[in-house]
Amino acid sequence: NELCFQEKAQIVGCELSHVCEPDFDPEKPYEAMARRMVYHALNGSAIRRIEAGIRHAKETGADGVVWFGHWGCKHTLGAAQLAKRKFEEQGIPLLILDGDGCDRSHGGEGQTSTRLGAFLEMLNTETDENTDRQEESHDE
């Protein structure tokens, strides 16, 4: 898919790989593993996940965020609109994509590609407009 190989479109983070790394006593490895589970953003309320996502997006300088809603995951799907509102209040555009992360036969690849392409185009337009505004302010 051509969307995966665009220079201007890069994945800068994934909430599943962003884990809590608390200080721990090497003599208590099970306690350390338990802390990683308990304090991970996906363990807890939806607002905890949303706030962690906003923090990660800001830390990485992301231009936008894709919120993938796994079919059948009430936690993810139920929080999608709240996430959209919270991210956008922080100036971070968010695209909600629903799909089946386990079974590709459920399809939707064409629609997903179209929606992702439109989102990337919108982000590119916003970036270009911001660059133009910055150049205009420097010219004055």
Question: Model-predicted segments: where are they?
Answer:
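An N-terminal assembly and electron-transfer interface module characteristic of large anaerobic redox
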Residues: 1-140
